[in-house]
Regions:
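P-loop NTPase motor core
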Residues: 10, 15, 26, 61-126
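Alpha-helical scaffold elements adjacent to nucleotide-binding pockets in ATP/GTP-utilizing enzyme cores
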Residues: 33, 46, 50, 54-62, ...
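Walker B catalytic acidic pair
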Residues: 178-182
Length: 191
């Protein structure tokens, strides 16, 4: 009996798909296109269910410091050694999804957004080590991790986290925001 490759139904995590041997349509050429047509901000618009979330996960896996480069073995992008040497695993990455911010009120949306910020900030605990950040920076970071955020802190939370990561790593930060339109759609729906 022939062995079948598993289909990744409902799986939007690039690392899981590659590690667990799921069928994967190689879209790593998008990384090359992105880098060859670099912009300060890049917006990817496609209809629902066109793989945007999986592509965001792929971008994170490619760019993030400490990435497992074996995830890309045998894929299109691995043939471009110069590009991989220059960019793979070289950047701090903030990756959030606003899919869960589907609240029916401002207060509930704020609470959900705060949770997303807290979870992402926790992913970067390494910045508390060493002396690259001063005590004020570390206190700002801890306010993001603990959720001890006033309105202004929450509004500027991504900018703050980006600045702290940039200071710690001395590199530009890649920020990936998936489902960015969900809070806007819910706000429009609920007035």
């Amino acid at each position: 009996m022939a062995e079948f490759i598993k289909l990744p139904v409902g799986i939007e995590n690039f690392e899981k798909i590659r590690r667990d041997g799921f069928y994967y349509v190689d879209k790593t050429g998008l990384i090359e296109q992105l880098l060859n047509n670099w912009g300060e901000v890049n917006l990817f618009t496609r209809p629902r269910r066109f793989g945007k979330t999986l592509n965001m996960s792929m971008f994170k896996c490619f760019f993030e410091i400490g990435t497992d480069q074996s995830l890309f073995e045998g894929l299109y992008i691995s043939k471009n050694k110069a590009l991989c040497d220059a960019y793979m695993g070289k950047y701090p990455v903030i990756s959030i999804s606003l899919k869960g911010v589907n609240a029916d009120s401002y207060e509930n949306a704020r609470s959900l957004l705060k949770r997303i910020v807290m979870e992402e900030a926790k992913m970067h605990r390494i910045i508390m080590s060493g002396n690259r950040l001063d005590d004020i920076d570390k206190a700002e970071y801890m306010s993001l991790v603990t959720g001890d955020m006033g309105e202004d802190t929450l509004v500027y939370s991504m900018k703050t986290l980006t600045a702290l990561l940039e200071k710690y790593y001395e590199k530009k930060v890649i920020v990936l925001i998936d489902e960015y339109d969900v809070p806007l759609a819910k706000a429009n729906e609920n007035g």
